[in-house]
Regions:
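C-terminal beta-strand-rich structural cap/linker in extracellular carbohydrate-active enzymes
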Residues: 692-715
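Acidic, contiguous internal or C-terminal segments within carbohydrate-active enzymes
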Residues: 108-166
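Acidic-aromatic substrate-binding/catalytic surfaces of carbohydrate-active enzymes
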Residues: 29-115
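Substrate-binding cleft of carbohydrate-active enzyme catalytic domains
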Residues: 301-463, 477, 484-490, 496
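Beta-strand-rich recognition/accessory modules
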Residues: 31-33, 194-300, 700
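Glycan-recognition surfaces
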Residues: 390-422, 426-430, 434, 480-591
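C-terminal outer-membrane/trafficking sorting elements
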Residues: 2, 12, 719-801
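Carbohydrate-binding surface patches
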Residues: 573-576, 581, 628-673, 753-755, ...
């Protein structure tokens, strides 16, 4: 028996040697060069360096330098430890093929063993590289006894200064807020000082647009972050990409929950370097969709309609809503305020003032007018006041167990968690789930098609423990609860509209508000456009981005919003993705809220602009043109200039948030369009034709907006594209909504259109001859247009499935 065991052991050692390169106490670096990436483990410094390579294999840029990966854990005896790559005596590299949601590629694993603290643990860092992708992934794990626990793993942890970019005041680091509560803002900080961004960030040169994008693609367990200490507007002193963040901005009062061993692994982290950081952010969103596809269950078109909270708030009533519904049906919708399917949504918020019978009557009346009705819920909030009787019974299990408030509430440091005026409920608790299941079933039976879900971030605050004993982190608890709720809604095809909510996980909602509590003044428009300035790319995570209720004429100081402010707020909705206006249009309402006569007057001027409504019907968010020109010079200020490109038009929206005229010129090369690519430029609010010669001239009055539409030559593009001969390029469907494009000559750009000529995706190639495309949002026949380096182009038709 012993002889047979020895032979088996020898075979295992031989097979391992084929894949593993051991390094023990020596000064040789371990180098991985694969595609556009070069990863070097510098043995003498016990640290990683990551370089981006040019097509020929020469180093283009060092994007991460001197990264000493960090793991914090409790060992088998419960002693808190911290180890880095420098803590281990041995390191070995292994290589294996992988084939997962990102496609076929290679995984390079660095295993660190024999830590100086004497624990029987190993640390493993994996790098995943896929041909044709402009990014790689990396994660970090700590492995040992089943009793180990970890709540902090940093696959990237730079602790020494290096220059990422030449010093320039246009260089920026993007801050992404964890949620949309507390009037938090996106930020584009100059590269000097400390910044923390949640789940993703970009460090980029504003003027060249080159940028490094870092972030997490797994959102079922961890809260992750990117933090940096920067200097000289281009240098990195510290840079950490890690799982296990807990701050006041994540709404946590206690540390991140600890994940159980014997193997604890961070989220996979996206590392990508792009010629245009905006493309990088969009690519990051698409990468997330490969892991967890977004919810795309809504088939009734871009949401246009009315929202009850914005002006009426809690002084709503059945009679008022019926009158407003009639006004939409009789006046606004026939004149063009609706989506391209002719649909309208009436979203009834908290305090709608209706009984169940009135709800049924209202829904039935709306159905006759081709209007759908939405309702309101707060799935994880316990509205009990601050001093409830914790022994109150909320529900009873099938076995007779009674669930009290104390059983259901989340606790931190033994005390119930109070947030945003309510106590937070455990998303894993059977009562929380059953209450929402009953609510959804009942609302659907009434005829509601749309549910606004508010304060859902109450379910993602770290607690001491959860009803489900296997759950130890806030994100895992939230994911369990939201997955259950989403499955209930999918039974009935209902729209989930998240209001106050975290950005990640995203896959449970059809829409999410980009910024909350936004009314109608120019200051409110600027606040909302700040979220588009830094977060436009989130429309790839949600079927629609929501600009919040669009108020034209509101209450108090909002009664006197100027017509320019009205245009700006309305356009804010159109360049975001949804159009739920919230004015009080009822002439017979006696609540004292709003000014119905003025609202109807403004509606005729603003809400019936056919061209703006056609633009809004796309349901897409516009990109910032610059990315570093904040309107007021502050890091959290909105930008003025935004753009969106499809095959028929290029739209450029210019917002003026200030009390004086805004005028100037935008070079066409910044808009990615040449002078011979369009036949006219029209401003959509004044209907003025604009003369363009190398630059787009703009002039925007105080507190107003202008939208410039370039009409591209070639009409919609579909006919022209189908007539172009595809003779050099081969496009192969790979399944999984992926295409491989092979070419006999250098390609500069690939564009993918649907059969109606709508642009669905682009990829800049910089002279490559092959590229794999991921199209997570596309299904069906596609037209693929290839732009070659020599200026020619051609198209082929293919199936995406």
């Amino acid at each position: 028996m012993k002889k047979r065991l020895d032979i088996t052991l020898i075979k295992k050692m031989f097979l391992l040697s084929l894949w593993t390169v051991p390094v023990v106490s020596q000064a040789d670096d371990i180098v991985v060069a694969d595609g556009m990436w070069k990863i070097t483990y510098m043995e003498s410094e016990k640290a990683f360096r990551i370089n981006v390579l040019n097509e020929g294999g020469a180093a283009r840029k060092c994007v991460v330098n001197h990264s000493v990966s960090v793991a914090r854990y409790d060992n088998a005896e419960g002693v808190a430890r911290e180890v880095t790559t420098a803590s281990f005596a041995d390191v070995a590299r292994a290589e294996e093929a992988v084939d997962n949601e990102f496609g076929a590629g290679k995984c390079y694993t660095f295993t660190f063993s024999r830590p100086d603290n004497g624990d029987e643990v190993a640390m493993k860092q994996r790098f995943y590289i896929y041909p044709g992708l402009d990014y790689m992934l990396t994660d970090l794990s700590v492995e040992g006894h089943a009793a180990i626990r970890s709540n902090y793993l940093a696959p990237v942890s730079v602790d020494a200064n290096y220059t990422l970019y030449m010093s320039d005041d246009g260089n920026r680091m993007l801050k992404v807020p964890f949620d949309n509560d507390g009037f938090g803002r996106y930020g584009k900080y100059k590269m000097s000082g400390e910044v923390i961004s949640y789940e993703v960030s970009a460090l980029y040169e504003g003027k060249s647009r080159e940028g490094l994008v870092l972030g997490s693609v797994d959102h079922n367990l961890w809260k992750s972050a990117v933090s940096a200490n920067l200097s000289n507007n281009g240098s990195v002193n510290e840079l950490r990409v890690y799982s296990g963040v807990s701050t006041s901005e994540t709404r946590d009062a206690i540390p991140h929950g600890k994940v159980k061993g014997p193997v604890v692994t961070s989220a996979r982290m996206f590392v990508g370097y792009f010629d245009d950081w905006r493309v990088g952010m969009e690519t990051f969103a698409d990468a997330n969709n490969l892991v967890a596809p977004r919810t795309e269950t809504w088939t009734y078109g871009t949401p246009f309609g009315w929202q009850s909270w914005g002006v009426l708030e809690s002084k709503n009533s059945y009679a008022t809503d019926v009158e407003i519904s009639d006004y939409y049906h009789d006046v606004l919708t026939p004149a063009g305020f609706c989506n391209s399917q002719g649909n309208i949504i009436f979203s009834l918020d908290a305090g709608d003032g209706m009984s169940n019978v009135e709800h049924l009557n209202f829904i039935n009346q709306c159905k006759k007018k081709n209007q759908m009705v939405g309702c309101y819920s707060t799935p994880f909030s316990m509205w009990s006041g601050e001093n409830p009787n914790w022994d109150d019974v909320l529900g009873t299990a099938s076995d007779g167990t009674k669930w009290t408030r104390w059983d259901v509430v989340l606790k931190a440091n033994g005390k119930p968690i109070w947030y945003d005026g309510a106590y937070c409920m455990d998303p894993t608790h059977p009562y929380t789930k059953s209450a929402m299941a009953n609510f959804i079933r009942t609302q659907y039976s009434y005829g509601f098609k749309y549910i606004k879900m508010d304060f859902v971030n109450c379910g993602i605050i770290q607690a001491d423990s959860y009803y489900n004993p296997e759950v130890t982190t806030a994100v895992a608890a939230y994911s369990e609860g939201m997955d259950y709720i989403r499955r209930q809604m999918d039974k009935y095809g209902m729209f989930a509209a998240f209001s106050i909510a975290p950005l990640f996980p995203y896959q449970y909602a059809n829409s999410r508000r980009i910024a909350c509590d936004t009314w109608g003044s120019i200051e409110q428009t600027e606040f909302s456009m700040n979220a588009i300035s830094g977060g436009w790319w989130t429309d790839r995570l949600f079927q629609y981005n929501d600009p919040d209720h669009l108020v034209l004429v509101g209450n108090k100081d909002q009664l006197n919003n100027t017509i320019g402010e009205n245009r700006a707020r309305y356009t804010n909705g159109a360049v975001t993705g949804m159009m739920l206006v919230a004015d009080n249009f009822s002439l017979n309402d006696r609540s004292g809220q709003g000014w119905a006569e003025r609202s109807r007057e403004v509606a005729q001027i603003v809400m019936l602009n056919k061209d703006i409504n056609e633009m809004a019907d796309m349901g897409r968010s516009f990109r910032p043109v610059y990315g570093y020109k904040e309107y007021n010079g502050n890091a959290d200020g909105a930008e003025n200039f935004f753009m969106f490109d499809n095959d028929k038009y290029l739209y450029v929206a210019v917002f003026n948030y200030q009390k004086n005229e805004l005028s100037g010129n935008i070079p066409l090369d910044l808009l990615d369009i040449s002078s011979d690519a369009f036949s006219e430029v029209r401003e959509l609010w004044t209907n003025e034709l604009i003369k363009v010669d190398g630059n787009l001239p703009y002039s925007v009055p105080e507190k107003d907006v202008r939208v410039y539409r370039f009409k591209k030559t070639g009409g919609s593009g579909v006919k022209d594209m189908e007539n172009e001969a595809m003779v050099r390029t081969k496009v192969v469907p790979l399944g999984g909504k992926r295409l491989m494009v092979y070419s006999g000559k250098d390609m500069n750009r690939i564009e993918v259109y649907d059969m109606q000529g709508r642009l669905n995706g682009t990829r800049d190639l910089s002279g490559r001859t092959q590229m794999e495309l991921d199209l997570p949002h596309f299904n069906g026949m596609a037209l693929v247009r290839i732009h070659y380096a020599d200026g020619t182009k051609e198209v082929c038709k293919t199936l995406v499935y």
